[in-house]
């Protein structure tokens, strides 16, 4: 999550589509925008850990990673009353040591399967194209919360996904209720399938919206 100027818009857009999303926030964001995190949580959206200081965790000292992760979780729990169990690595970068450390802390490391690349400020039409084509059940769509083009594109994205038959839920809802699990690379996969082969998720029409 970046700034907070679109918080109310996002809550309204998601509510109108009856959609729930997972927001990965940093501790620094929590320091600045605790009220916005509370609004998102109260609206039924999931708040997850995106680190405290947004460091590069690949090659990071284990004790430093643990401390940084715990601090972000502490801040989120202070605001929402719930300790997060999902973690997204800053920059999408990690290594086996970091993943093992985070798993040992009870955190599921989450990656995305469809990136809107909205940080590059594409047109709303481009965002729609990237996030509504070739979507399969269990997909995690990545957006950033404080970009105007994303806010403009989102109603059409949500409408298209629902018309394709997808239920829009949080990552945790899919893990708890769906036929999916997270592998050691943070990738969503069916519990009953091997990861070495290309997979078409045909048995569960859930898609996940993730913001950071």
Task: State the predicted function of each range.
Residues 1, 24-28, 51-52, 88-92, ...:
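Active-site-proximal beta-strand/loop segments in catalytic clefts of secreted hydrolases
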Residues 1-60, 64-78, 82-84, 176:
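Active-site beta->alpha N-cap acidic-glycine motif
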Residues 4-6, 32, 54-55, 93-97, ...:
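Active-site environment of divalent metal-dependent phosphoester hydrolases
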Residues 14, 47-50, 72, 87-90, ...:
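Conserved, mostly hydrophobic/aromatic
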Residues 16-17, 21, 30-32, 149-211:
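C-terminal domain-boundary segment and adjacent tail
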Residues 62-67, 125, 148-151:
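Non-membrane alpha-helical structural segments and their capping/turn regions in soluble enzymes
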Residues 85, 93, 98-134, 166-178:
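His/Asp/Glu-enriched short active-site or ligand-binding loop at hydrolase and phosphoryl-transfer sites
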């Amino acid at each position: 999550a970046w700034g907070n100027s679109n918080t109310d818009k996002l809550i309204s857009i998601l509510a109108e589509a009856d959609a729930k999303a997972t927001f990965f926030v940093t501790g620094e964001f929590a320091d600045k925008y605790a009220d916005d995190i509370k609004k998102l949580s109260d609206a039924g959206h999931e708040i997850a850990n995106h680190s405290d200081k947004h460091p590069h965790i690949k090659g990071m000292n284990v004790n430093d990673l643990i401390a940084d992760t715990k601090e972000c979780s502490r801040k989120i729990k202070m605001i929402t009353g719930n300790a997060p169990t999902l973690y997204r690595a800053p920059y999408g970068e990690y290594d086996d040591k970091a993943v093992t450390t985070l798993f040992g802390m009870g955190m599921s490391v989450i990656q995305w399967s469809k990136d809107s690349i909205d940080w590059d400020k594409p047109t709303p039409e481009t965002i729609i194209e990237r996030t509504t084509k070739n979507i399969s059940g269990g997909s995690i769509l990545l957006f950033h919360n404080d970009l105007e083009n994303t806010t403009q594109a989102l109603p059409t994205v949500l409408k298209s996904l629902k018309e394709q038959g997808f239920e829009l839920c949080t990552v945790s809802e899919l893990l708890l209720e769906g036929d999916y699990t997270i592998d050691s690379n943070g990738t969503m996969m069916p519990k009953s399938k091997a990861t070495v082969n290309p997979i078409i998720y045909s048995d569960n029409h859930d898609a996940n919206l993730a913001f950071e």
